[in-house]
Amino acid sequence: MNGWRDIKLKEVSEYVTVGFVGSMADQYVEAGVPFLRSLNIHPFRLNYNDLKYIPESFHDAIKKSKLRPGDVAIVRTGYPGTACVIPADLPDANCSDLVILRPGPDLNPHYIAAVFNSSFGQSLVGGNLVGAAQQHFNVTVAKELKLRLPPRAEQDKIANNQRRIDLLESMAEEIYREWFVRMRFPGCEAATFSKGIPEGWEVVPLGRHCHVVKGRSYASEDLVDDPAAMPFVTLKSFNRGGGYRAGGLKHYKGEFKSEQLVKQGDIVMAVTDMTQDRVVVGRAARVPDLGERGAVISLDVIRLVPKKVDPTYLYLFLRFSGFANHIKEFANGANVLHLKPDLIPAQDVVMPPRALQDRVSLIAEPMLQQAEKLAQNSRRLSEMRDALLPRLISGKLRVDALNIQFPPSMQPPSEAA
């Protein structure tokens, strides 16, 4: 832990402020400066669906909430603490009701975004929410957050690992969109199209190609803080916009059916959303390696079991085709949104031939597996850190007493060099 130091977030930031707070209904225009809201902020990436725009004049009038590449945007309400870095391809933007963090030279923006999106960061934010009716992450609290910060070089290594994961997932998404959304699949030049659908493709209910398994209902006393109990995949196991969120895993001691077990590579979908933003309901994730026993799915989750469809293609379709944006509109509820699982297999979908499904699977599956492997290694290191850090800070464990073996890439340069 050499070089680590205790800091407040404001001490390593150029500034920490809040996005515009006020009525926006009469400010939106068809084209102009991108205007980000909470629903556009997903873990580690922006979601451009339902992106709003404001005129340049209003953008200049609310200078405090201007964003630039490298800023970290953090959600205040709904899913507080969710964070992403403003990318280089968004040179000019503004926002409402977000915490804006502009890192100083000692803080890697991708590292601090990873901290906020981790189970540690979510717990830290969750313990500092304010408000009675709707809790939110206050900017004053954000400035005073205390963290133990590694040297910039170590931050960069950690951040680069997360960016490799994002890149692999983005590559798989781009291949899917190129082939099955833009219809530039291999052989498309010779294909005959009818009403936008290539000949040989079919429009069928999704249930023709997969079936749905509903999760297990449970009582609060069935959830236990005991790793020996069964891992339990709940609504908390989903990132905003889809994908698996490791920090949300629970443990369960109750009964379940064998079909409610999921294992590595299985596809699950959230059928509940705790907010009205609809950024979790209808979203899919792939189950990572959770051990030989697998995990049980809760009532907020369904399992989609492939029948006549390639499993990797099915996952890509559910994540990246726009199906989630379609199905989420069927969810209803005053405070908590619920989506009836039986509606999902009833939806008509465009299904390409199996040969084309298999072909994209051969390309995308290794990318997804590598991303999952990197994420799992990162989770294991985080678990070790979370277990050791309190003892190191308290002095109960000395760093010089640890036999830590570093890989060659992390070895410090020799004095001779």
Predicted regions and their residues:
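Sequence-specific dsDNA recognition surfaces
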Residues: 6-26, 39-69, 89, 94, ...
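A short glycine-rich beta-alpha junction/loop motif
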Residues: 2, 91-99, 107-110, 122, ...
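Non-catalytic DNA-recognition/assembly elements of restriction-modification systems
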Residues: 1-20, 144-217, 354-361, 365-401, ...
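A short beta-sheet element
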Residues: 37-38, 56-117, 234, 259-319, ...
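A glycine- and small/hydrophobic-rich beta-loop-beta segment
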Residues: 322
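Short coil/turn segments at secondary-structure boundaries
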Residues: 22-30, 50, 127-128, 190, ...
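Hydrophobic pocket-lining residues within nucleotide cofactor-binding pockets
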Residues: 41, 142, 238, 301, ...
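Short, well-ordered beta-strand elements within core beta-sheets of diverse protein domains
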Residues: 99-103, 144-149, 156, 195, ...
